[in-house]
Regions:
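Conserved, mostly hydrophobic/aromatic
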Residues: 28, 77, 135, 179, ...
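Loop/helix patches that line or flank the sugar-binding groove of alpha-linked glycan CAZymes
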Residues: 436-617
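Substrate-binding/active-site clefts of carbohydrate-active enzymes
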Residues: 138-158, 162-327, 337, 344-356, ...
């Protein structure tokens, strides 16, 4: 049987560890191997263990059964192709690892699951109603200003009586969180400028990957965020598998507050520097290779996972279902989704919706030179809308590439194009999406400059390579706040779900901290902080108080959006546009149970005058404040100040 036939024959096999009443069965798909053994270890740091020969089936799956009374705590595989390197199970649900860029690891045989979910289930929130906070779990609590007793951990994230973590989500009214990767990843990278190594690292003096887009194990939670997680070199971590239940406890606590949990997942490539199981076993099967057998890297991350192969697709789907069933995850954001073949995209949609019809599927619709938000929409996915992002703020302040909030129309577009973006960028109007709920609008993500730094550079507050301190830039000027508020009003009155990045609500700066002493860019504004587990990324909650005026505005806008469904998702037939006296202004009239009128003026120099539909209108938001209780009333004519907006309501 050929390898291509083997994977089809093996697709229904349950891989990894399976429990029967009296025994545990171990299975590994490795059709190219001549010999595979299961290795059982009593201790996590044992260099050798008990080897049990595995039987190779005709479909390329190796299998062995072990009676319950013969089980140990840890296991791995020894395969002919990996030499002396033992290989953890690629389906590991928990691992113990030694902190080193190669990450020697063993799989943990967890006790039978008895976690008490206390009646918790996935949330039933509709994607179009979401206000998503994109956040790094550690960044949200590790700074001393958070007041957390267990900083940087799953447990710390949901502590009561703190300023960060779950308290911040509740304070702002966010109803979803999108965590940067929580699957076990290679957070220690190759030594800096070590000539004894085969790879010369002259780009990462931090020797780290902070964000997590280097997945090592697709079924296991990240150890570093557990109560036993440390990053000290040479130390073994995760011996007890504590991260498993601690992550479940975090999800349960978030659900109790009505907050949906979305995981950022990476299936387009795997970890680069550690001994990844998929690289040690079945490299030729699981990766896209060139003619010389070397890894292709259109992802830009050292390798490209071959999602189109049957067993690759099986792993991706079973990984997603594992997080849904075992961790009650409500949705996923897919990194570089354009690199996932559409047959796999379709299979993901079918499999996840069979478990949860309301599953949230969001693609980052680019990668490897591709760009496919329209195709993802046709397969039922939502996508980040970079057209909205660029049209509102611009693309690159270093190139004087500005958008609406700076009095410009990005990329030669006109206000008619801007209106299409505000009503969901629908395929029926030449856009990407079949309906507004697929349109995830945002202004900032973990990538690139924060919108705060974008505005700082655009106003020449800070040069692109200028060295500053946080104290110099943390407090926003009135000019900066004006632009921030217009951006926030644009975002939070757009159709479909919206995403807000951590720290966005106070215009945070990413000033490169000099934590390693060898970063030549220390003190500059950072546009790619993937490697920095320091104050470059950590949220300083004092800055939230420092810029409370902008924070209050965001909080008020979120409350208005949550209260009035017309703002979030109304049929196209119930949205009409009106023009203001300025060419850089327009209004959106949305009708449902209530009539909502949003007026926007991007003009930097002129007030825009709007003739209002008949009746008395209550002001919900103006240039300074946003409040569901109202800020007075207006009729006939509205004057919208430069670089500002209004939200008006007329109850039916």
């Amino acid at each position: 049987m050929t390898s291509s036939n083997m994977d089809i024959a093996a697709v229904d096999e349950k891989l990894g560890l399976s429990r029967n009443q009296d025994e545990v069965v171990f299975r590994l798909f490795a059709p190219g191997e001549d010999q595979v053994s299961l290795v059982l270890f009593e201790k996590y740091d044992d260099e050798s263990g008990e080897n049990l020969a595995m039987l190779k089936k005709s479909n390329g799956v190796w299998e062995v059964s072990v009676p319950n009374d013969k089980l140990t705590k840890y296991y791995a595989y020894s395969a002919s192709s990996s030499g002396e390197i033992i290989t953890p199970d690629p389906y590991s649900q928990a691992v113990v690892r030694q902190n080193h860029f190669k990450y020697p690891s063993k799989s943990i045989i967890l006790p039978k699951d008895n976690f008490d979910w206390q009646g918790d289930e996935v949330t039933s929130a509709a994607i179009g109603d979401l206000v998503i906070l994109e956040a790094h779990l550690r960044d949200m609590t590790v700074h001393s200003s958070s007041g957390t007793q267990k900083p940087g951990t799953y447990q710390g994230f949901v502590e009561a009586d703190q300023r960060g973590g779950i308290s911040h989500l509740k304070d702002m009214g966010y109803n979803a969180i999108e965590f940067l990767p929580l699957q076990e990843f290679g957070n220690i990278e190759i030594d800096y400028k070590n000539s004894e190594l085969s790879t010369w690292n002259d780009w990462n003096p931090y020797e780290a990957n902070h964000w997590g887009y280097m997945t090592s194990f697709f079924f296991a939670p990240e150890i570093y965020y557990g109560s036993d997680g440390v990053k000290d070199r040479g130390v073994w971590v995760g011996q007890e598998g504590r991260a498993v239940n601690e992550m479940k406890e975090m999800v349960r606590a978030l659900h109790k507050e009505g907050i949906s949990v979305i995981l950022d997942v990476v299936y387009n490539h795997v970890s680069q520097y550690d001994d990844n199981p998929f690289k040690l076993i079945n490299k030729d099967y699981y990766f896209r290779l060139d003619e010389a057998g070397e890894y292709l890297s259109h992802s830009g991350c050292g390798n490209d996972f071959k999602t189109e192969n049957t067993m690759s697709r099986k792993m991706i789907i079973e990984s997603l279902l594992h997080w849904m069933n075992e961790y009650h995850i409500d949705g996923f954001r897919f990194d570089l989704a354009a690199m996932i073949d559409l047959e796999t995209v379709n299979a993901i949609t079918a499999a996840t919706q069979a478990v949860n019809p309301n599953i949230i599927l969001i693609g980052e619709p680019w990668g490897g030179g591709g760009y496919n938000p329209r195709e993802l929409a046709d397969h039922g996915w939502a996508s980040w809308n970079d057209h909205f992002r660029n049209s509102v703020k611009g693309r690159n302040p270093r190139e004087n590439d500005y958008g609406f909030i700076f009095g410009k129309l990005w990329d030669g577009n006109n206000t008619e194009h801007y209106k299409k973006l505000m009503r969901g960028y629908l395929q029926s109007e030449g856009g990407h999406f079949k309906h507004p709920a697929q349109n995830v609008n945002y202004l900032e993500s973990h990538d690139d400059n924060t919108i705060g730094d974008f505005i700082r550079m655009s106003l020449d507050k800070v040069g692109a390579t200028e060295v500053v301190t946080r104290a110099q830039v943390a407090q926003l000027s009135s000019e900066e706040i004006t632009i921030h508020k217009l951006a926030a009003l644009n975002l939070l009155t757009s159709q479909g779900p919206v995403m807000i990045a951590q720290g966005q609500s106070w215009g945070r700066a990413k000033v490169i901290a000099n934590s390693v002493g060898s970063d030549q860019n220390a003190g500059q504004l950072d546009h790619n902080s993937y490697e920095k587990d320091d104050e470059t990324n950590w949220l300083n909650w004092d800055e939230k108080e420092l810029n409370h005026d902008l924070v209050d505005y965001y909080r008020g806008l979120v409350a208005i959006r949550n209260k009035y469904a017309e703002i979030r998702n109304v049929d196209t037939g119930y949205r009409q546009f009106i023009n203001g006296s300025s060419e850089l202004s327009f209004g959106v009239n949305m009708t449902g149970e209530n009539q909502i009128l949003v007026l926007l003026n991007g003009d930097q120099k002129a007030v825009s005058e709007f003739s209002l539909p008949p009746g008395i209108w209550t002001i919900l938001a103006n240039a300074d404040r946003a409040d569901t209780k109202g800020l007075g009333s207006i009729e006939q004519v509205a004057e919208v100040a430069e670089q500002s907006g209004l939200i008006l309501v007329q109850k039916e």
